[in-house]
Structure formats: structure tokens, C-alpha cells
């Protein structure tokens, strides 16, 4: 038995210690004997006598080697003969009779292609040939390998390679072939779709792709061939992926897809019918992004008829809930999507149908004497009513529905929900209440009287004993809209009853449930009502009284005997601690030094009890600094120690995130009292920000902390300046380009915020240097800085007013110091944009900044 086989067996051991030892020994062996390890693996893969698990692991290990950049240099040092040996053996193993070996080899080849394709390896050409081989296994494995190569290479593939891969897939969607081949082609194709945009831009190629998929379904429909159900499913998913990426190119071709999907709407396979409906929902998503209903508007009548028919023909299954009605749920989502993109005619038709449902003879009889109806009549009545509410839920996403319809239906819904425990379709009705809040809360929030009546009704519903916990959770979600969107002045007088209702739910029997956790959500909402209520004397008095109860609950939460599991105990503690944090951050309570210390000790007990630091704890500890340095100073050293610990665990970026926020709160509260801890803090933050895997949000928080540190530190912080300046330069380079059409919304928002934090940090550093008479340090950077901050206020960057104000102040500060030398870099057009935006703003602070820069730049304009 060879050494590498022995190591593989260790790696596959069920014993954790043996497995870890084997993995380390394998890595060491492969690092010292790189080629031998690879060649041995290849020999094992092609050896039919070797155990299957060892052969599979060999392929997996080769993939690991080629996937990690640390081995690339060793691979590049191999001779041409050695490289060819590895390639030939791997390619040969694709012909293995064993599917497991073919799959493992396919992944290894794909990983190798990432290294060798740019050097001219003809693997695409070879796989193209084998994808047309008479042996079906060759075809299938070639297609799988193509998919894996695309997965590894992504957008780095050349267009000619993409074209070759695409042709191979299309050629294998031929009804003359074995259905196992067709299945693989249609299944793997969904993963290729994101990378064929150029092909979709070409009308002929686009038509060819759509026709190839569509013809398979059409041939099945006219029964010229019985297409496997899984293939039909794959093709429908392919259409979904095509629309997810290429709605903007599909208008001329969509009529073919539409015709096919309408047939599938009413097929006898509910799963396929649901997928065909989902195709239209995906199309709506694309239209929503493009801000047009240029395709769906042409099909409103047909869609309305088809969707109504789906609801009429579904099984009379009154089982309520999100997971019980596959096609029905998909249809409801589609109605919602069609409404969101503005298909008014369809919405009107659906509202008309709802009215017909609720006013037919069966429903009139049910309204008068439901209890005396026969069982079949009751089922029919409930079925009709459920259909009406399911459709109405979808329609509610149309924001231009007549307000009278909304407010009238709201009262009927609440009336229905008061008998919730005897209503088999309660969940369907409750969701309508939620969707009214989601899309039309402005109608509830318009008048104090309407708002108060609605709030009182929701509180009454929450006071009821509701058997269906999902419905109770929906009511809590409605309460979230009241708290988050409601006028704070409107719910001031209800603050006590809202808090008491939520806490009663949080601690009621069976409220803690993993599937539907009423307890944790109630605690979350309690924190939110405290955050959002106004800081009136009466409210603060109420919250101060509640805080005493909260403190007692925290003490009780430290007793594990009060809970069924450790997880339950931890989650209740987290909820309580988060409420305390809300009280602290939003200054809804007052505390003296002794009370602050008492809260700290409870949190410390919780940390010790769990034997780990957790994010709610570090967040709350940082928030205690908001009560002022004089009160916080007694626990400062202990809290800062926890902050430093939180910044150690780079694997838990969420904990780091809260640690950075806590550090910032404490630094701002303590001023220069915490200077002694700054060097340790800087070292920790620099390690975090240099981590290549750092999340975007955490990077922004690091910049914010740097700003706070430089504003408040003494000259000793200067040793970190070169590294931070380089960080700024790198940040500018990475965020200089304006947004493009392909950039997603999250990236646009991140870059906007990131640019703002760069400017804030520049301001902080400049103030620091000015205070210590070292502002000349900026001289070597000023050219690049001015160009950057002048550029990012231009309209194509869509700058926020806060960014414009920050840039204005920064330019003013720079100009006052550097004066004439800045004339070379200043962009008058950018200054004009800044002046114009500040003049348009109604914010008093912006007016002050405007006055400042008008005075500062007066000589610049006079000399221009």
C-alpha cells in the first residue's frame, strides 16, 4: 500500500483526531512531494482495482490542489511531460464506467482549466468533441465538465470558448438522443445561462436558444415524443434563469415562451404548472427592475382568465398555510408581481372576480346561516372565501387601489379575524391584513383617529388566545408596521399597553418555538417601540418603570432552571440585553454609576455562564458609554478588555462589527481618557481591515473608528498614519469609477457610503495633523485627494447630500491651509455642483457649510 493511500485512509477515518492528523500529514507530504502526490492520485483514479472511496478522494484532493493558489507556483515549475501526464490521466478518467469517478475527475479538470486555459490548453475543444461522442457517458460527463469549468472560470472565459460550450449544450438537446443526455444538457444549462449575455444580444442566437428549449416541450405536448418529467422541469427552470438575466433582450421572443407556459398552467402535474407560473413572476421581476411592463401588459386578459381558472380548479383543500398549496401559492405570487409592475386591467379583473365570489348565492347563504349549511355547502363557501382572500392578498401589492376599497376591506378582515379560532382559512385572511400594512399603511397613518382604532383592534387580536401560532406571528408582524411606520405621536398613549402586551406574549406558555418564535419576536418589537417612541417626559417615565422589571427578568434569565434548553436561555438573555441597549442608545432611561455597574455585572455573568463573548453583550456594553464618561469610567477598563477580545475573533465578523461600534462609542464618550488603549485598538483594527474576506459593512465601520480615533488622539497615534493613508489611497482607487448599468443596488449603496467614510476619515486626520502642526504631511497626497473628492460629487455618482456636505467642508479646510497651491487641482465645475446642491437643501447645517465655503473660496472665484 502506497504512502498516499495510507494518508487518504486516515483522512476518511470516522475518528476526528485520526482524520485531522491525516489531513495535516497529507498537506505536508504533498507540499514536499508535489508531483509524486499528483501522479500517484492520477494512477489511483484510473486503477479499477483501487477502492472506490480512495479513487473518489484522489479526484477531490487533486481538485483541492488546483483550486488553491498556494500550489500554483509548484505546478508551474513542473516539466511539460509531467503536466501532460496529469492532464492525459485526468481526461482519460472521464471515460470511467463509474459515475462517481467521472464526477470527481470532472471537478479536478475544471479546477485545472482555471490555471491552464489561459495558457492555451485545448480542453474546450476536446470536450466539445467528446460531447458529440456516440457513448452517452462521454456526452454526459463532457457537459458536466463544461458546467464545472464555467463555474470555476466564471466571466474569465473567452467568448469563443463560451460559444463552443453553448453549441455543445444546444446540440445535446435533440430528441433523437437518449433522454439521459437531454436531461443532463437541460439541467446543466441553467448554470451556463448567466455567462451567455453576448449570445442573447444576438437575435439569431437568442432565437436559436429559445427555440431549442421550446421545441422540446412542444414535441412533448403534441405527443410526438413522451418527454421525461424531469426534463420538462429542467427546461422550465432554464426559462426562469433566462428571464432572471435577460428580460431586456427577450421582448420579441417571449410570445413563444408565453404560448408554452399557458399550456402548462393547466397541466395535470402541479409541480410543472407551478414552474410555468413562476416563469411569469420572474418576468415581472425583470420588468420591475427595468421600470416597465412592456411584455406582461400585452397578456393581461389571458393571464387573468388563466389565473382565475387555476383558483377555481384547485383541489378543495382547506388546509391553510404557506406550504400546503404549491400551484396556488405560485399563482398568488404571480398576481402580486403583475400588480407591482402596474397591470391595472388585470388588477381590476381580479377585484371584480373577488366581488363575484363574495356576493354569489352560496356566500349570501353562508353569511346568513353558515352553521345550518350542509358539510358540502360549508366546504364550498370556505373554498370560495379562501380563493377571494388569496387573490386579494396578491392584488394588494398594487399601490394605486382605490383607498375606499382598502379601508372597507380592512374592517371586514378584522371582523373575520375576531373569530379566528373557528376559521379554517384564518391564515389566508390574516395575510391580507399584513399586506394592507405592507403596501397601504399610509392610509392607516393619515389620521390619528383611524390609526388609534386600528391599533386598538390589533391589540385586541393579540390579547386573544390564538390556537394557530403562525397567525399570532402574523399579528405581531402587523404590529411591527405600526411601530416602525406609525406616527410616534399617535401611539404615545398606548406605550404601556403595547409593552405589556408584547412582554406577556414573550413569556406566555409555548411562545418559544423554533418554527414560529413568538417570544423572541415580541422581545425584538419591545426594543423597537422603545427606540421609536418620542422622548417625552411621560414616555421616559414609563420606560424607566419598565426597566426595573426588565432588570429583574435579566436576573431571572441567569437561572438555567427557568428554561428548557441552554439555547432558549441564551436567546431570552439576548432579547433582554437588546432591549437594554435600545434604552441606552436612544436615551430613554437614566442610570447612575451604580446601576451601570450592576448592568455590567449581569452581562459579565452571562458571558461567564456561556464561556464566550457574544454580539448582544458587546453591543450593550458599548451602549452604556452613552451615559457619559463620569458614570462609565468605573467599568471602562473591563469593557475595553471585552472590546479587544471581540476584535480578536476575525472568523466571527458579526462580533467584530459590534466590537468596532462599541469601541467607537467608548472612544467618543471618553475623549482622551482612553489614549492608553489606542495602540492596542489600532493593531486589532489593522489586522481586521487587511483581511481579504472582510465584509463591506465591517470595512466601513473600521473607517468610522479610525476617524474617531484621529479626532480624539494625541501625537502618539502618528506612527499609524502612513498605513492609514495608504488605506485611504487604496480605498479611493477602488471606489473611483462611477456606477455602471450592471452594478447591483447593494454595491451602489455600499460605494456611496464608503466614499463618504473616506471623506470623513480625511477630515478627522486633517484635523489631527492641523492640531499637531503636521498638516504638511498632506502635501504629497493633496493632488490625488482633491481630484477624488471633486470627482465623486458629480451627478453620475448620484452623491447623497451628506457626502456633498462632507466634501464641501473638506475642500474648505484644505483650501484654507494650502490656498494657492490648490488652484492647480480645484475643479470649478465640481465646486459649482456643491454650491448648487447646498443652496437647494433646506437643512440648516447645510446652509452653515454653504456660508463657510462661500467665504473660503471667495478669492478663488475672484481670481479664476
Segments and roles (model prediction):
Residues 1-864:
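Karyopherin-beta/Importin-beta family HEAT-repeat alpha-solenoid scaffold
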